[in-house]
Amino acid sequence: TKSKVIVLPCEAYDEERIYTLMKNGLSQLGGLDNLINKEEKILLKPNLLKKAEVEKAVITHPVVVGAFARILREEGYKNIVLADSCGHGTTKQVIQGTGMDTYLEKYQIPAIDYTKGVRVENPDGVQAKEFILPKELLEAECVISLSKMKTHALERITGAVKNSYGFVYGKNKAIGHTKYPSADSFARMLIDLNQHVKPRFYIMDGITAMEGNGPGSGDPVAMNLILMSTDPVALDSVFARLVYLKPEMVPTNYHGEKMGLGNCREENIEVVVVEENPSASAVRDEGSEITGREKQRQNAKVSVDKKQIGIDVVCNVISMEALIEKYGNPNFNVDRTKVRNNVWTKLAKALNIFQKKPYIEPDKCIRCGICVNSCPVPGKAVDFRNGKNNPPVYDYKKCIRCFC
């Protein structure tokens, strides 16, 4: 069966617009009643990598979280908490002052800090046979992932699948980078983790995404989209296509399909665009050509659902080509380098040679110390060993290549 990915075009963090589009998008996934039982304990898991200004696109935008929280409350869901195993700091520390804390207070959703890690067996895992997961996560009956559209130095992109790494408790995240140092082993572990925790569905904030040196130090870039799906691999594959990256070049997509988490191939993904009514006539015949405001598609053929979803909102089943033509960004700064699969690259991979690693450019370094303070490794893998008047130095024997 095809996986359905919902695309919500939205050019600003406007709560009312996001709320309306998201609510109608959820109806395309069968509605919340078919996804979540009213009595279930719900855990919302945004991307809270570290404390940062929301404009820097490091964390899931508070307005996206707030709009979804509003929908949950209006639909009668009562038992809801929000948490993440943050890269730096606690959940409460990271959200303080971002506006997310204000939304959570408004909708009476507590932000909780994980207090205890529990070792759980994962006998069916391909890469990871056990995890250390937070007690509070294990107590939840329904997990909803609210990721951020970003690049990632190791996995090329971080989205729905990678967001689940925030399920791992505390310092065990740093240990995981050491235990699974290659892009492939880390990706397989992430697939195992998603299959173990089984988030009910996934939302990706891509209104302002991050390109370049992600996931923590890249540049904000407007993509003007929110993506939703019950299939994280399909969701990340659409993200990849939107930035002109072949989905199978993303290790979590490649292994995600191979290991049965979801669909990576285009023919197995149905894309539905839920958008504001582009004209006075919201409902068109199926198979008609879109013109006028949507001329950017250059008369691309789309299949249009005859049912109008909500006031001034329409639902279009659209081809991947038409989606990319209208909403894609070929200039998005992401690693599109092809990985050569010959005897030398296999040998280098086996011996951990030519691994990607962080590097400080002495001419550009301002000696701010952020890299030193952010390093999660006990004893620090980067420090001012040559004095604070000189750039910090990495100890690659200690470095876990977290790229945070």
Label each region the model flagged.
Residues T1-S279, K295, N299-P362, I366, ...:
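N-terminal and secondary-structure boundary signal
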Residues S281-G287, T291:
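Ser/Thr/Pro/Gly-rich low-complexity, intrinsically disordered segments
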Residues E289-I290, Q308, C399:
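Generic short N-terminal amphipathic or hydrophobic helices
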Residues Y396-C404:
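Short Fe-S-cluster ligation motifs
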